[in-house]
Amino acid sequence: MTMYTRGRYNFAVTNPRFTGLAAPYSCQLRNDVSCPRSVKQQPRLSCLSIMWLMAVNWSLCFFFGSASNHEDQPAQGSAVLEELVIVIQSQKNSYHAQRGYQRKEKILQDAANLGEGPPVVLLLHELSDYEGNWSILPVLPLLSAIYGESASWFLFIEEDTMVILHVLQKVLKRYPIQEEWFLGQRLHDNKPSIVHHYAFSEDPTSFGYPDPAAGWALSAALHQRLAERIQSENLKSDFTIDLTHEIALFIWEEGRGPKLTTVPEFCTKTRDNCATKFTNYLPNCGNPESKNNIFVAVKTCEKYHSVRVPVVKSTWEKHAVYLEYYSDVTDASIPTINLGVPNTERGHCGKTFAIMRRFLSEAVPKVDWLVIVDDDTLISLPRLRRLLRCYNPKEAVSLGERYGYGLMQNGYSYTTGGGGMVLSRTAVSILLSSGCSCYSDDAPDDMVLGRCFTSIGVPITHSPLFHQAQPDDYSGTRITLQHSISFHKHWSVDPVAVYTNWLQDSHPNDEL
């Protein structure tokens, strides 16, 4: 157990993931831009400094205590910014880590330009070594222990979420900090969604959850209660699928907690008076990755040769230079390859590991990227090539839509197979050489890969452009703003129409 002291309170962090993490946060408290790369000794406070802090604290009490009677009164000094903790939901992959550093430096520079004390800005992937911190709930006790007494608000943003600090100050001033607030741009389902386990099936629009791209905020009062609940209730979790929906459910707590409060200034579409903005759904890192550097593996079986395979051939197959269909039988008309692994009704772990072994063999061209999809996956290879330009194939990269399993109990993350699993050659080589393997041929391949990568320290890299389900299973507000890369399943839809409407570009850049 690690005991942290903040003000007059002691906060015990019993989770072993957080033991020994106090030193990095003394650095983060000072907003040292070099904190991601070095941790310095915490400065000592002089008597004058302590007296100054006491005076500031007294002023803040007066200000916030009278805020409800003077809502139009301008913010006093830099109190709001200095009491704001911004958590950038960064990732360990080098591309995403760099994006996180850049966002942090931009926020701190903007604060300096305002002539005010800066907020605390943290990179999520640096808070501890635990891979599951991306699900937010596991890290709330640590944030509360370190910043619970100094912060009034906690803002969670993505790497490409812009923060307009002076507008954000005005927005947060509207909400009394002693109360529990959960703020964001509201999304809702238009129909019962498999992604959300068909929650609120009688009226899916009745439950709101925040758009992660616009950012979402917790008041310190709510944050502290959630952290204490996580510490005391021995919470269990199985699958983490749609992060902000599940966080909203956790906060709402069957009506015992607050629902999301819609804040129009939390934006994804640029307009006047935005406190946050988000525009970079599909990054531009230069020319797309070459078609000749990607190998596509399609998993199929005999009963779908005449049903699903024709959809692949009529939609996205033409954008692949190297593509093979792997089945339980050989069919020269497609053609398919029999890897000698019996077909299974579920899981397909044996087939996937056989695909990876073939990818590293001399039987196929030596390229940097392996893309493994189901025969009912719809995918835009031109958009994928544009995204892959951002990643270094010399790194161990496992990319796709990230899910989690048992993350409140030191579980693991994985990329969902239906949305497509993208692996660098380096990642495949490290995985196979580790000796990690299927416990049975019908084990869930995507989950086994995630467990294996977690065990050898390879991070799972998330992109919201991959989708395990169909377009209608996601919020229309968000999905229409994306340049999606994939969808999954042919149930009750015209898959060709889905591909045409959601994934096909009028002028794909296919010359490379």
PLM features: residue spans?
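Secretory-pathway lumenal glyco-enzymes, predominantly type II signal-anchor Golgi glycosyltransferases
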Residues: 2-512
